[in-house]
Amino acid sequence: MLRTMTAILAFGALATPAMANEPVALGEIAYGPELIEHAEDFGERELDRLAGYLRTALERELAGELGEGGYTLNVTILDAQPNRPTMAQMGGTRALHSSSISIGGADVEAELVAQDGQVIETYSYGWRSMNISDVVGYAQWTDARRTFARFADQVSDSLDERAGSGS
């Protein structure tokens, strides 16, 4: 399986303020240009579904750290591919059927921003299935949702690590 996992520190630990007891608010979930281009194929309503899946994953993983008045996590879904055709795709192409399968996945990035606008940390994660036989039985956005869950876990672990180290 192709896994691209990177957490990139925007600044060194000495240049960042302590995160202990600082709440994190979920900011805007934006869409990257590639995703917007693909939305023409799979339908605009799918963007809202993807943002909802990502927000749910982040809220679940960051439950103990969410709040106002601290940092803001701004997230961008760069790209996503469904494992099964969307309604818009099936309506536009006779060859597609709801049982059609494909390799899905997503690419996501985020910035953790302090109240003064300083970017404290950036995150990036992308994942795709490598083998079409792996996606048999999957729902429409299974790989994208898996990507979002792993990304949220990565962000949560990073925030916990920063809070524990006081940087």
Give, region by region, the residue ranges found by the protein language model:
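Bacterial N-terminal signal peptides that target proteins for export
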Residues: 1-6
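A structural "domain/chain start" motif
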Residues: 8, 12, 16-54, 70, ...
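Surface-exposed short loop/turn segments
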Residues: 68-119, 130-135
